[in-house]
Curated annotation (Swiss-Prot):
Membrane-spanning intervals of the chain: none
Binding residues for ATP: G165, G166, K167, G168, Q169, G170, K171, S172
Keywords: ATP-binding, Chloroplast, Nucleotide-binding, Plastid, Transit peptide
Protein's UniProt name: Ribulose bisphosphate carboxylase/oxygenase activase 1, chloroplastic
Transit peptide: 1-56
GO molecular function, one term: ATP hydrolysis activity
InterPro entries the UniProt entry points to: ATPase_AAA_core, P-loop_NTPase, RCA-like, RuBisCO_activase_AAA_helical
PANTHER family with a match to the protein in the record: PTHR32429, RIBULOSE BISPHOSPHATE CARBOXYLASE_OXYGENASE ACTIVASE, CHLOROPLASTIC
Family in the record: Belongs to the RuBisCO activase family.
Gene: RCA1
Function: Activation of RuBisCO (ribulose-1,5-bisphosphate carboxylase/oxygenase; EC 4.1.1.39) involves the ATP-dependent carboxylation of the epsilon-amino group of lysine leading to a carbamate structure.
GO cellular component: chloroplast stroma; thylakoid
Key word Kinase present: no
Source organism of the structure: Larrea tridentata
Length: 476
């Protein structure tokens, strides 16, 4: 046992040979510790000269560099500080974060991933595509936008332009054509965004969209805030609608922005940095439903849009510009339906395609429409452009007018509301005089009101009394 211990110690004391340096491998003793079949060989690696050792970095070859290369960032700086800060939101100490998207973590919309949801971009030229812009409409809109970007001395310029008029007269589309003509990508809002289940959210959204437009202007590009159908979201449509806190906040926010257009802050975050002035364009059908101080002349410039005969003809030429309809036929079509809105002629053009759709349905069968339209390898069907003659257009126009007259003539809603769900069953009650026609009991004069003592502290208190007759008796 002692001999084995000394042998192991001899092995541990033997010098180790690496790369041919030091003692040779043949000096390793042959002991029983390594076994009888151990093959002993010496390493033959050449020695590396420490004086001539160099590390050379190869220059970057842009041909070999691809977008899929995960190490691309080592050669080029592809980071975005704003996006990196935003990604770190919620991952660092909240002490260094401003609340409500107002601190450094709130990235300025500068890349495609951060384009505002309300930003509308146009890819058309109204001159090339043949769209018609009414001269009066364009003059009003261009002048309002231009003077809001000018520094006019000692002049208070209304920030808001309210364009109102009848339904379907092309107010929104004419605005978009003017924006495209001027090279403006507006920040869009609709009436549906002016109400929310949370109090104050629509007012905050207006301020956010206004500041987004201000950021675009700060970068050197014209922008404006465009709100569609303001009266539908913030107006009062009689007793059938409820006036909520959000309605009040929307009106108050627009009034405040109109008074201080260069100092629009988000709730709870205030700084002294001024933002660029952003013109606001709103559309609606009846601005008398809005809060009166909002539409006063110092805050809102109002423009009533009623297209003339020339405007209607010009717009209709743009509607039928690809259908090879003669100009004389368009004039005849407009004169035949003088009381209709411009939207009527767009619906009239769409009605002409009914024959083509009906023909295609008869060919493929009603039971296979879903497979052909939604889950088809061939894709949706394509139709040849139908020939639009003046006789066909006048015929379909007459059908649309007849449908409008039926709605106004029948008025089933009034019939349902007056007769409730009982229909003719109310006739007997009406004849007997016991049917109040939906009026409350307090509104009918012949309903008796019980009198008596209504004071609970009195000894003769009558809980069924609805009017005090002065007969209360008190015990002292």
């Amino acid at each position: 046992m002692a001999a084995a211990y000394s042998t192991v110690g001899a092995v541990n004391r033997a010098p180790l040979s690496l790369n041919g340096s030091g003692a040779r491998a043949s000096l390793v003793p042959s002991t029983a510790f390594f076994g009888s079949s151990l093959k002993k060989s010496a390493a033959k690696f050449p020695k590396a000269s420490s004086g001539n050792f160099k590390i050379v970095a190869q220059e970057i070859s842009e041909d070999q560099q691809t977008d899929k290369d995960k190490w691309k960032g080592l050669a080029y700086d592809i980071s975005d500080d704003q996006q990196d800060i935003t990604r770190g939101k919620g991952m660092v100490d909240t002490l260094f974060q401003a609340p409500m998207q107002s601190g450094t973590h709130y990235a300025v919309m500068s890349s495609y991933d951060y384009i505002s949801q309300g930003l509308r971009q146009y890819n058309l030229d109204n001159n090339m595509d043949g769209f018609y812009i009414a001269p009066a409409f364009m003059d009003k809109l261009v002048v309002h936008i231009t003077k809001n970007f000018l520094s006019l001395p000692n002049i208070k310029i209304p920030l808001i332009l309210g364009i109102w008029g009848g339904k379907g007269q092309g107010k929104s589309f004419q605005c978009e054509l003017v924006f495209a003509k001027m090279g403006i990508n507006p920040i869009m809002m609709s009436a549906g965004e002016l109400e929310s289940g949370n109090a104050g959210e629509p007012a905050k959204l207006i301020r956010q969209r206004y500041r987004e437009a201000a950021d675009i202007i700060k970068k050197g590009k014209m922008c404006c805030l465009f709100i569609n159908d303001l009266d539908a979201g913030a107006g009062r449509m009689g007793g059938t609608t409820q006036y909520t806190v959000n309605n009040q906040m929307v009106n108050a926010t627009l009034m405040n922005i109109a008074d201080n257009p260069t100092n629009v802050q988000l709730p709870g975050m205030y700084n002294k940095e001024e933002n660029p002035r952003v013109p606001i364009i709103v559309t609606g059908n009846d601005f008398s439903t809005l809060y009166a101080p909002l539409i006063r002349d110092g805050r809102m410039e109002k423009f009533y849009w009623a297209p003339t005969r020339e405007d209607r003809i010009g717009v209709c030429k743009g509607i039928f510009r690809t259908d090879n309809v003669a100009d004389d036929d368009i004039v005849k079509l407009v004169d035949t339906f003088p009381g209709q809105s411009i939207d009527f002629f767009g619906a009239l053009r769409a009605r002409v395609y009914h024959d083509e759709v009906r023909k295609w349905v008869s060919e493929v069968g009603v039971d296979t429409i879903g497979k052909k339209l939604v889950n088809s390898k061939e894709g949706p069907p394509s139709f040849e452009q139908p020939k639009m003659t003046i006789d066909k257009l006048l015929g379909y126009g007459g059908m649309l007018v007849q449908e409008q007259e039926n709605v106004k003539r029948v008025q089933l809603a009034d019939k349902y509301m007056s007769e409730a769900a009982l229909g003719d069953a109310n006739n007997d009650a009406i004849k007997r005089g016991t049917f109040y026609g939906g009026q409350a009991a307090q509104q009918v004069g012949n309903v008796p009101v019980p009198e008596g003592c209504t004071d609970p502290q009195a000894t003769n208190y009558d809980p069924t009394a609805r009017s005090d007759d002065g007969s209360c008796v008190y015990k002292f």
